[in-house]
From Swiss-Prot:
Tissue specificity remark: Restricted to flowers.
Entry function: Probable transcription factor involved in fruit development. Key regulator of the transition between the state of 'ovary arrest' imposed towards anthesis and the fertilization-triggered fruit set.
GO cellular-component term (any): nucleus
Gene inactivation effect: Parthenocarpic in a temperature-dependent manner, thus producing seedless fruits of normal weight and shape under heat stress (at 38 degrees Celsius). Normal pollen viability and sexual reproduction capacity at ambient temperature, but slightly paler, narrower and longer petals.
GO MF terms, alphabetically ordered: DNA-binding transcription factor activity, RNA polymerase II-specific; protein dimerization activity; RNA polymerase II cis-regulatory region sequence-specific DNA binding
Major localization class: nucleus
PROSITE patterns, alphabetized: K_BOX, MADS_BOX_1, MADS_BOX_2
Name under which the protein is recorded: Protein AGAMOUS-LIKE 6
K-box domain boundaries: 85-175
GO annotation (BP), single: positive regulation of transcription by RNA polymerase II
Sequence motif Nuclear localization signal 2, location on chain: 138-145
Superkingdom as given in the UniProt entry: Eukaryota
Subcellular locations according to the entry: Nucleus
Length: 252
């Protein structure tokens, strides 16, 4: 028959309890030794009996294992900081290497430092440049087509606005012609003003003759608008009086 399952509870009999402790202690120490040998693990085992007696096992020494345990468990913040620093250092190293590679690639694309490249690397570089040039030309053509389409759209919009304005002007002209009124264009007033100004530009005024005085000079030709006639007339009359006195002086 198989061995039955042992019920896990305190053994009341002191002799049986001591025998069980001895057997299981030896088995536990044996298993710790086997684990350290088979798996190359650092094992430390400490056992205190019910009477306070110490039993221990350490594959690398109890003291050394305890010191290592204290460094790992009693100072977790320091360990975390050290691990974080190491992680950041590795990340910086990776980024630095990537940055140097990108700088080297950029110099190659600019045609610099090509002496160290092989024929195959130069061919790959040539293909990259041709691909980049093709993409740049394609993008430029796309932008030009978009600009042309935008200009065509604006042209169509302006054409529609022009047609609407022509229709509106035609309707207004038709309404004025139907009512028998003149066309109220701004330039019609300008033409009328120009006609009036042209008709009043040249005026010939004969001065009044005095039969009691001697013969006066020939009629005076005055050129200008009506608003300047008053001032010119006053100055002209004064000049005529002076000339009349001179003529009378010669006559005497």
């Amino acid at each position: 028959m198989g061995r039955g399952r042992v019920e896990l509870k305190r053994i009341e009999n002191k002799i049986n309890r001591q025998v069980t402790f001895s057997k299981r202690r030896n088995g536990l120490l044996k298993k710790a030794y086997e684990l350290s040998v088979l798996c190359e693990a650092e094992v430390a085992l400490i056992i205190f009996s019910s009477r306070g007696k110490l039993y221990e096992f350490g594959s690398a020494g109890i003291t050394k294992t305890l010191e290592r345990y204290q460094r790992c468990c009693l100072n977790p913040q320091d360990n975390c900081g050290e691990r974080e620093t190491q992680s950041w250092y590795q990340e910086v190293s990776k980024l630095k290497a990537k940055f140097e590679a990108l700088q080297r690639t950029q110099r190659h694309l600019l045609g610099e430092d090509l002496g160290a490249l092989s024929v195959k690397e130069l061919q790959n570089l040539e293909k990259q440049l041709e691909g980049a040039l093709a993409q740049a030309r394609q993008r430029k053509t796309q932008i030009m087509m978009e600009q042309m389409e935008e200009l065509r759209r604006k042209e169509r919009h302006l054409g529609d606005v022009n047609k609407q304005l022509k229709i509106k002007v035609s309707l207004e002209l038709s309404s004025f012609e139907g009512e028998g009124q003149g066309v109220p264009f701004p330039w019609s007033n300008c033409n009328a003003s120009l006609d009036e100004a042209g008709s009043s530009t040249f005026h010939v005024h004969h001065s009044q003759s005095n039969h009691m005085d001697c013969d006066l000079p020939d009629p005076v030709l005055q050129i200008g608008y009506h608003q300047y006639m008053a001032a010119d007339g006053a100055s002209g009359s004064r000049n005529m009086a002076v000339e009349s006195n001179i003529i009378h002086g010669w006559g005497l």
